[in-house]
């Protein structure tokens, strides 16, 4: 999934240009204060690149899931269409200003910001209000998305996407604007995200372990099915583990279980065996009779959960086993917590996995990738995020990428001019499943693909023939 086939911001001319940057500033806000600015900080390199090169930035983002007004709705007497205080980006504007060390203008209506954009000078920054205040942003109708995109595109000259977190959305700001402008470039964050996922999906250092957790097997079916053909080890935790354990005939007490997915769990375990993937499930558990915090939760001595109890975290023996598995690997990708880590009494398993990955990365060169969402939050809370190779900003996007799906927000970006032998490697941008034929340079051929191997063979044969003829001629001359 290397960006060699998509143009990056380094390929764009931004001097004296107004650069529309789609960022993902969907950050947690409480009482008007941002509680985690990781996504904002992650976008800074792209913003700073434009400012340094003599361009101006027009930042576009969403926050939350506001209801959204229609473009055709009349403007209210006070305020702007679609406005919801809980989803305003004003606090984000203040935080970006602090991080950049300069004033950031704020346009209170993203579709009535032409006057703000026209006043921009080189090295200025403008943040538009939440693009989801308009329903057209995520409309299922292409013509509605395009109508909004045309307005936004009129503000700028160049489009850059740095919003991997929404790359799985076909929206006005992700796919509509680059379509209107006729070009789209990847920002540094987008580039980093795709390059890391490319390595882990196409040609990772081995052994490779996938650590999968969360509540439901049904949420991870496609991920598991797609990854089983790529990994060496599968570590399962979280509530979804108990569907697998019941499928194996284990007692799970009153732990969460998807009864209608038991056959699916059996099928996935069988498929793992057929593909020589070693699966690890919890061997002990931290339990309680209710779904709430406890001063002294029960820690089981066996793999079975007692009647009347629900498992809410993995136990100490399981932690040790999972740490050992991670320790023997060269690559690890993590998607989903091991327990209810939001409650301190059930956080040890999740934090132990985070620590094992962080330590492995720093001391043993482990390539560690956190697949966004709850896993990213857990890595931050544990203090291990800084030690990982990569913590993704995209929960849903990373999940769909791991499932082998197309990411519209990546596919729309402009192709880079490359030689014919690289042009067919579409999976590099999440637009198909990898195959040795379609992606020879990244799918296992040590010489870079069958076509290249054939060319090398031709050259070697020609050299051998030349040597043979040369020797025959030399022999004749000597005689």
Curated annotation (Swiss-Prot):
Subcellular location: Glycosome
Pfam families tied to this protein: PGK
Keyword Zinc-finger carried by entry: no
A cellular component term, taken from the record's GO annotations: glycosome
Keyword Transferase among record annotations: yes
Residues binding ADP: 214-215, 220, 238, 311, 335, 341-342, 374-375
Cofactor(s) needed for function: Mg(2+)
Enzyme class: transferase
Domain of life according to the entry: Eukaryota
Residue numbers binding CDP: 214, 219, 238, 336, 341
Residues engaged in binding ATP: 215, 220, 239, 311, 342, 374-375
Molecular function as annotated in GO: ATP binding; metal ion binding; phosphoglycerate kinase activity
One GO BP annotation of this record: glycolytic process
Catalytic activity: (2R)-3-phosphoglycerate + ATP = (2R)-3-phospho-glyceroyl phosphate + ADP
Family: Belongs to the phosphoglycerate kinase family.
HAMAP family: Phosphoglyc_kinase
Protein name (record): Phosphoglycerate kinase, glycosomal
Gene coding for it: PGKC
């Amino acid at each position: 999934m290397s960006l060699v086939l998509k143009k990056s911001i380094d390929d764009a001319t931004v001097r004296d240009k107004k650069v529309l940057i789609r960022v993902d500033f969907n950050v947690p806000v409480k009482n008007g204060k941002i509680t985690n600015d990781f996504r904002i900080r992650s976008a800074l390199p792209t913003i700073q690149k434009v400012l340094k090169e003599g361009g101006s930035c027009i930042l576009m983002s969403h926050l939350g899931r506001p209801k959204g007004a229609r473009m055709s709705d009349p403007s209210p007497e006070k305020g702007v269409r679609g406005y919801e205080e809980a989803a305003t980006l004003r606090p984000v504007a203040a935080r970006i200003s602090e991080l950049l060390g300069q004033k950031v203008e704020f346009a209170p209506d993203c579709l009535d910001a032409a006057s703000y954009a026209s006043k921009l000078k080189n090295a200025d920054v403008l943040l538009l209000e939440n693009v989801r205040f308009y329903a057209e942003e995520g409309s299922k109708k292409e013509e509605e998305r395009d109508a909004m995109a045309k307005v936004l595109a009129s503000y700028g000259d160049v489009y850059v996407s740095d919003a991997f977190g929404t790359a799985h959305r076909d929206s006005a700001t992700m796919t509509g604007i680059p379509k209107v402008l006729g070009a789209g470039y990847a920002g540094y964050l987008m580039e980093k995200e795709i390059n890391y996922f490319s390595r882990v999906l196409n040609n990772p250092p081995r052994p490779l372990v996938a650590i999968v957790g969360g509540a439901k097997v049904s949420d991870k079916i496609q991920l598991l099915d797609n990854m089983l053909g790529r990994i060496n080890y599968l570590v399962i935790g979280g509530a979804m583990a108990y569907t697998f354990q019941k499928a194996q005939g284990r007692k799970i007490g009153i732990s969460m279980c998807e009864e209608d997915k038991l056959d699916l769990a059996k099928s996935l375990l069988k498929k793992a065996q057929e593909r020589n993937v070693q699966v690890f499930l919890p061997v002990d558990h931290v339990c309680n009779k209710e779904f709430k915090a406890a001063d002294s939760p029960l820690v089981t001595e066996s793999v079975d959960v007692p009647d009347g109890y629900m498992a809410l975290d993995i136990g100490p023996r399981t932690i040790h086993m999972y740490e050992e598995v991670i320790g023997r690997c060269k690559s690890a990708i993590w998607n989903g917590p091991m327990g209810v880590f939001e409650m301190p009494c059930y956080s040890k398993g999740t934090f132990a996995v985070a620590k094992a990955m962080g330590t492995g990365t720093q001391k043993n060169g482990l390539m560690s990738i956190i697949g966004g969402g709850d896993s990213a939050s857990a890595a931050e809370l544990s203090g291990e995020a800084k030690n990982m190779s990569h913590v993704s900003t995209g929960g849903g996007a990373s999940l769909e990428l791991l499932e082998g799906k197309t990411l519209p927000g990546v596919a729309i970006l402009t192709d880079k001019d490359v030689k014919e032998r690289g042009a067919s490697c579409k999976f590099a941008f999440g637009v198909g499943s990898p195959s040795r034929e379609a992606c020879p340079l990244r799918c296992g051929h040590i010489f870079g693909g069958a076509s290249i191997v054939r060319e090398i063979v031709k050259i070697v044969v020609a050299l051998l023939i030349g040597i043979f003829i040369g020797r025959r001629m030399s022999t004749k001359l000597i005689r």
